[in-house]
């Protein structure tokens, strides 16, 4: 049968919200419309966009926005129906699972830590951080591979916490998800034919191009349709699981 790989976008796929970034903006009562408009006009690259958005978050309060505060703001993230069933069933049948997203790393790592391996945490390519492993998975590594954007911790604060760096975490380019999928395939020994990708927007067509099963889920608009093999509009990842099981000949739940 061979090995299989499923690559999942996070925002509007695993997370039932416009984006993990937007969830934080909503909590703080701020808007990134200005930087978003500049990016769409080609006046900002993605690296500068992330830095501007982090500056917006940091300037939203007279008190320093610490790493711990930002983590707190992300608690209560709404999750998509069937997210846990999808990932757990795939793992139960030895399918390799990756999150490939431009969203914030905190949520992706929390998701990944829900599925711990039997191995102690270690720093690795596509792994989670020590803090998440300690807080969420009893110090164990995750079975998933995680690639996201977000923030970096800065120098210690007076209260013992850590600040937020002016420079963001930039692992996933808007149009570079296909390169991440290809690296995963090469490292994990999985063919394109045995790879499925699930995403909602044009930012995911790079993943689609490297996958034998490209699933457009909860479409943001119609543009990605021509790049996908399948379209699922209902916000239920159980339907995605059924499709992937059928495509790869896996047992269904």
Feature locations, PLM:
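Metal-dependent phosphoesterase signature
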Residues: 50-89, 93-95
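C-terminal cap/substrate-recognition subdomain and adjoining C-terminal extension
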Residues: 74, 81-96, 103-253
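Ser/Thr-glycine-rich phosphate-binding loops at phosphate-binding pockets of nucleotides
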Residues: 13-14, 100-102
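Short glycine- and Lys/Arg-enriched binding-loop motifs that mark or flank ligand-binding interfaces
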Residues: 8, 38, 98-99, 195
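Active-site neighborhood of HAD-like aspartate-dependent phosphohydrolases
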Residues: 1-55, 62
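Residue-level preference for alpha-helix termini and adjacent loops
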Residues: 13-14, 43, 76-78, 150-152
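Residue-level signature of transmembrane alpha-helix interfaces in integral membrane proteins
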Residues: 25-32, 58, 216, 228, ...
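Short, surface-exposed acidic
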Residues: 32-39, 62-70, 120-122, 135-143
